[in-house]
């Protein structure tokens, strides 16, 4: 069965470009191209697409309004096409909160290599979206519990442990849900979420507003502090190194690892090497296998490993690969994951 795709974009150039890319893939079937939300609504009813690529900025009815109506009337897998601006990034995260599966920046095709890389990426995202769990099909997010109901962590744990998290498709909302359940006082948290440049700073700012923790985009060479969360910048690997008695960040422009930059494997490998048994790591929703090798090293070094359960994942790819390797100690659905991680940290020897 081919995957039926509807392209919705007010730019004829983008519509035709995406249409040609989709038509060139035998696994996909282009069922229509719409220039605005009104045309799109008719085509959704007529063709019942499996996946919709949706421009955020459209005339008459904008992409967010259309997405909200679509998710209420006929939930469908949607990949947002987003502009590389601060406003575009904000709108993208609002779209993901409304139920969009994934997003991709608008193409900047300055060379044949750019075209080929963009084509590979958009086709991969469309195929992944077709097999994703929609918001209505996933385990409900946890209700945020007040800090007084959370187990207290000892000063030793807060100052010696390191929490590492990796995610891809569906990860922005999963990370938000997880961090919202953490208390304000935590060991340093480092996160790699697959995301292009131009979006990670806005993502960090969003998390900073919506959680009790201090969240920021990681900078090179900064000391990791308790109560802070550090997000890997787009197109840069985030590593943790130990300098003296302190954990510090290192950002690099190395080759893609497991197909990604930033890579979860790069982060997890570095944390395993410098924090060892003082590592608590979680691998969340995402396609592919990035993070499985790193989880194996964390397990080998004596760290504690968690994976998000299938029922709450948008795409159960990265967790599945790590679980298959036999290196995950606890498989937990997202609503219960924060409590499981906190209970483990609270159980460690007190000072």
From Swiss-Prot:
The record's account of how the chain is modified after translation: Phosphorylated by CheA. Phosphorylation of the N-terminal regulatory domain activates the methylesterase activity.
Annotated InterPro entries: CheB-like, CheB_C, CheY-like_superfamily, Sig_transdc_resp-reg_Me-estase, Sig_transdc_resp-reg_receiver
EC class name: hydrolase
Stored Gene3D superfamilies: 3.40.50.2300, Methylesterase CheB, C-terminal domain (3.40.50.180)
Modified residues (4-aspartylphosphate): 55
SUPFAM superfamilies xref list: CheY-like, Methylesterase CheB, C-terminal domain
Keywords: Chemotaxis, Cytoplasm, Hydrolase, Phosphoprotein
EC number assigned by the record: 3.1.1.61, 3.5.1.44
UniProt superkingdom: Bacteria
Domain named Response regulatory: residues: 4-121
GO molecular function, one term: phosphorelay response regulator activity
Coiled coil: none
Compartment(s) of residence: Cytoplasm
Any one of the GO CC terms: cytoplasm
Location of the active site: 168, 194, 290
Family stated for the protein in its record: Belongs to the CheB family.
UniProt domain comment: Contains a C-terminal catalytic domain, and an N-terminal region which modulates catalytic activity.
Record's function text: Involved in chemotaxis. Part of a chemotaxis signal transduction system that modulates chemotaxis in response to various stimuli. Catalyzes the demethylation of specific methylglutamate residues introduced into the chemoreceptors (methyl-accepting chemotaxis proteins or MCP) by CheR. Also mediates the irreversible deamidation of specific glutamine residues to glutamic acid.
Protein's UniProt name: Protein-glutamate methylesterase/protein-glutamine glutaminase 2
Native species: Shewanella sp. (strain MR-7)
